[in-house]
Design a protein with these regions (language model features):
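Core alpha/beta nucleotide-donor-binding catalytic domains of modification enzymes
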Residues: 1-183
Length: 183
C-alpha cells in the first residue's frame, strides 16, 4: 500500500516523538481497528520505517474481535509493518473495563520486551485529553487536582495528544482506510 500523508501531519508527529525522546527508538504501536490507532500506525510507519511493530490486543470479549484483529493484521501486512495479535492468558474478571485495561498494558509491556521495542505508542489524542479534564473537573477535582493524560508514562508514549480526532480520521481517509470500530 502506497501511503502519502500531509507533510504538516508528519512534521507534527516527528516533533512529538522528539519531545517524547523516542524519535530514534523502536516503537510497539498498539493498534485496533479504530481511526485513532490506525492513524498512529500510518504516521509511525512513515516516520519510523524499520523501527515499528504493531500489536493488537484481542480480549476475546466480543464475537467479532478476532475478525477485527485480522483486519488490522491485513492493513499492517499491506503497509509492510510486522504485526502481532496478543490475547490474555486468563479470562477478564471483576470490573471489566479496569481489568481489560490492566491486561492490555501487561500484554503490551511483554510484547515490547520480546520485540526489543523501547516504547509503546498509544493513540490518545487531544479530544481524549479534553474529555479527561472535563470528567475530572465534573468529579470535583478542582483546579489543583486537574491533570490530563500524560504524554509519557514509563515506556508508554502518546504522540497524538496534539492531534484532534477529526485530523486522525482525515489521515485514515486520505489513504482509503475506513475504520470498522471506534470504541
Amino acid at each position: 500500500m502506497q501511503v502519502t500523508l500531509k507533510p504538516v501531519f508528519l512534521d507534527r508527529f516527528r516533533a512529538a516523538l522528539c519531545r517524547l525522546g523516542c524519535a530514534d527508538d523502536r516503537l510497539l504501536c498498539a493498534v485496533s481497528d479504530g481511526p485513532d490507532s490506525l492513524a498512529l500506525l500510518l504516521l509511525a510507519q512513515q516516520i519510523l520505517p524499520g523501527k515499528l511493530v504493531a500489536a493488537t490486543v484481542d480480549h476475546q470479549l466480543r464475537s467479532e474481535s478476532a475478525d477485527e484483529a485480522q483486519l488490522v493484521a491485513k492493513i499492517c501486512h499491506d503497509l509492510g509493518v510486522p504485526h502481532i495479535i496478543l490475547t490474555p492468558e486468563a479470562e477478564i474478571a471483576g470490573n471489566l473495563q479496569s481489568s481489560a485495561r490492566a491486561a492490555r498494558y501487561a500484554l503490551l509491556e511483554r510484547a515490547a520486551e520480546a520485540q526489543n521495542c523501547q516504547h509503546i505508542g498509544t493513540a490518545h489524542h487531544a479530544d481524549d485529553q479534553l474529555e479527561t479534564l472535563l470528567m475530572r473537573l465534573a468529579r470535583g477535582s478542582g483546579v489543583d487536582g486537574l491533570s490530563g493524560i500524560r504524554a509519557r508514562n514509563g515506556r508508554v508514549v502518546r504522540p497524538l495528544l496534539e492531534f484532534t480526532k477529526a485530523e486522525l480520521i482525515e489521515i485514515c481517509s486520505s489513504v482509503g482506510i475506513q475504520s470498522v470500530n471506534d470504541p
